[in-house]
């Protein structure tokens, strides 16, 4: 309870309400109860944003019918960004791993056998992989499955090892809808973008807000996806359609239960 009170007082400090007691029956208690189920960083960030707005427009406080509902507009904006970035990361990782599997198989596998990952060049990475995942052998595994077991850090190492094979993918002249895509002409240039994405990915997957500017992050992911021959617009459209379908089925199911 002490922690809830501490956070609640911090939220009130950021909001800097002229008359907090006026919201006693207008969302203030609901706000306090929500602390135990909402994301701390996003809740604090939302309260800071609302506090700044109320300082800029003091009369706005009198127009708030429910403090909790009003604050949730700012909170939900942050969680929606988190979910959107999570989806971008999923698209990027999936496309990158699959494209790498195809290129490495074409360039370095034996004829009719997908065995590029058995190269001595990758022995350290493979032995570490087997140890982490408790694998005695890689019999029955193909390149797609192997790359799905590797971390993004190991993918970075593999791309560096085989940069001559991957450079055309990221550096060659390429257009999309008659627009020339920016190129990542050197390993260092690619690494800068990749490291940016990797850092944000780790933050998001550990349920933390990314400190990297969203516009910069999305821009780099979108460019890389298009260079990987992945159309993010189609993917987002299809995903949203699926979400709507799932939501509709859930509503129907709930209706049957009542």
Per-region residue spans from a language model:
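Extended intrinsically disordered or low-complexity regions, especially N/C-terminal cytosolic tails and loops
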Residues: 1-191, 196, 214-258
């Amino acid at each position: 309870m002490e922690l809830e009170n501490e956070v609640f007082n911090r939220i009130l400090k950021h909001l800097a309400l002229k008359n907090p007691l006026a919201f006693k029956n207008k969302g203030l208690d609901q706000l306090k109860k929500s602390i135990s189920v909402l994301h701390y960083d996003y809740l604090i960030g939302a309260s800071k944003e609302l506090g700044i707005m109320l300082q800029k427009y003091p009369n706005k406080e009198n127009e708030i019918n429910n403090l909790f509902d009003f604050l949730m507009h700012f909170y939900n904006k942050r969680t929606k960004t988190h979910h959107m970035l999570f989806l971008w990361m999923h698209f990027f990782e999936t496309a990158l791993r699959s494209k790498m599997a195809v290129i490495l198989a074409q360039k370095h596998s034996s004829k009719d056998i997908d065995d590029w990952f058995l190269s001595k060049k990758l022995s350290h990475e493979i032995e570490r992989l087997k140890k982490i995942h408790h694998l005695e052998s890689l019999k029955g595994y193909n390149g797609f499955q192997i790359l799905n077991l590797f971390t993004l850090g190991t993918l970075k190492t593999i791309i560096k090892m085989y940069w001559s094979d991957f450079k055309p993918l990221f550096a060659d002249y390429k257009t999309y809808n008659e627009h020339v895509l920016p190129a990542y002409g050197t390993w260092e240039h690619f690494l800068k973008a990749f490291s940016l994405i990797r850092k944000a990915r780790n933050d998001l997957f550990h349920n933390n807000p990314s400190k990297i500017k969203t516009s910069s992050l999305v821009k780099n992911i979108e460019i890389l996806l298009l260079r990987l021959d992945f159309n993010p617009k189609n993917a987002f459209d299809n995903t949203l359609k699926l979400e709507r379908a799932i939501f509709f089925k859930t509503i129907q199911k709930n209706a049957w239960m009542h």
